[in-house]
Amino acid sequence: MVNQNKIIPYLFLVPALVFLLFVYIPIFENVFLSLFQWSSFSPEKTFIGLKNYVELFHDPVFYQALTNNVLYAVISIVCQVFGGLILAAVLEDKLVRKWSPFFRTVFFLPVVISMTVIALLFDFIYNPETGLLNQLLQAIGLDQLTRAWLGDDSTAMLSVIFVSQWQSVGYIAMLYIVSIQKIPDELYEAARLDGAGKIQQFFHITVPQTKEMSFVAVVMTLTGAFTVFNEPYILTGGGPGKASEVLSTFLYKSAFTKDMMGYASAIATVVLIITLALSLMQMKFFKTGKEE
């Protein structure tokens, strides 16, 4: 019995050890491998120090991909976080609440659909010849706006980003619905008695009361925006040219097309630093706002 009591505390260390094994060790190994020039087909590795990072920061494709990720992040914050909050507030309004289960299902459905299916759907919608989008524009007399949405440098990235927003906004809205349901009805009732309208209630009650969920949503959205891969890779492959290249597709091509494993490890390290820095900034911002 005494021996069992001695063992039990060590059992609680198992999850931490598993986390260390599958998360931290691969991260450190990736950083270590980024200091070498090596190929997946050869066991030999040549130590080159920070040369991969120097080349990366002089590579115009890296800055093109980073710019696209920043654009992805900005649009995602506006559409997913702010848009998701507005959508959740509308679905939780008393006038819409009886229809809320139906609309929740409609908006959450894209979240559970495979990205491959979604890509095929939007590939059909964006098709320049038979796509629904161009046919709709022609039907309302806007023929001059029709184009190859995924094949045009000026629209490829925005078209890919739209797919992500369509798929993800419902998930963020569901998170906000849970948060809004925890807000006491007395706050809204008092605001109505003071003559506050729907918009005033939204900005003075809903937004402040869902601040913690907003923090979670922003961190998730920013992390997703800087690690996005499926949408640009399946829809455009990073093209046309490098118009829709993002850091993850850039990493993938460097590793598995060009077999530049050390260079790809350097890209992965930079992505890790960016996402970690953004998360820490959000934590600092959230703590500051909470203290105020």
Curated annotation (Swiss-Prot):
<feature type="transmembrane region" description="Helical">
    <location>
        <begin position="160"/>
        <end position="180"/>
    </location>
</feature>
<keyword id="KW-0812">Transmembrane</keyword>
<feature type="transmembrane region" description="Helical">
    <location>
        <begin position="106"/>
        <end position="126"/>
    </location>
</feature>
<dbReference type="InterPro" id="IPR035906">
    <property type="entry name" value="MetI-like_sf"/>
</dbReference>
<keyword id="KW-1003">Cell membrane</keyword>
<dbReference type="GO" id="GO:0005886">
    <property type="term" value="C:plasma membrane"/>
</dbReference>
<comment type="function">
    <text>Probably part of the binding-protein-dependent transport system YurMNO. Probably responsible for the translocation of the substrate across the membrane.</text>
</comment>
<feature type="transmembrane region" description="Helical">
    <location>
        <begin position="260"/>
        <end position="280"/>
    </location>
</feature>
<dbReference type="InterPro" id="IPR000515">
    <property type="entry name" value="MetI-like"/>
</dbReference>
<dbReference type="InterPro" id="IPR051393">
    <property type="entry name" value="ABC_transporter_permease"/>
</dbReference>
<keyword id="KW-0472">Membrane</keyword>
<feature type="transmembrane region" description="Helical">
    <location>
        <begin position="215"/>
        <end position="235"/>
    </location>
</feature>
<keyword id="KW-0813">Transport</keyword>
<protein>
    <recommendedName>
        <fullName>Probable ABC transporter permease protein YurN</fullName>
    </recommendedName>
</protein>
<feature type="transmembrane region" description="Helical">
    <location>
        <begin position="7"/>
        <end position="27"/>
    </location>
</feature>
<comment type="similarity">
    <text>Belongs to the binding-protein-dependent transport system permease family. MalFG subfamily.</text>
</comment>
<dbReference type="Pfam" id="PF00528">
    <property type="entry name" value="BPD_transp_1"/>
</dbReference>
<feature type="transmembrane region" description="Helical">
    <location>
        <begin position="70"/>
        <end position="90"/>
    </location>
</feature>
<keyword id="KW-1133">Transmembrane helix</keyword>
<feature type="domain" description="ABC transmembrane type-1">
    <location>
        <begin position="66"/>
        <end position="282"/>
    </location>
</feature>
<dbReference type="GO" id="GO:0055085">
    <property type="term" value="P:transmembrane transport"/>
</dbReference>
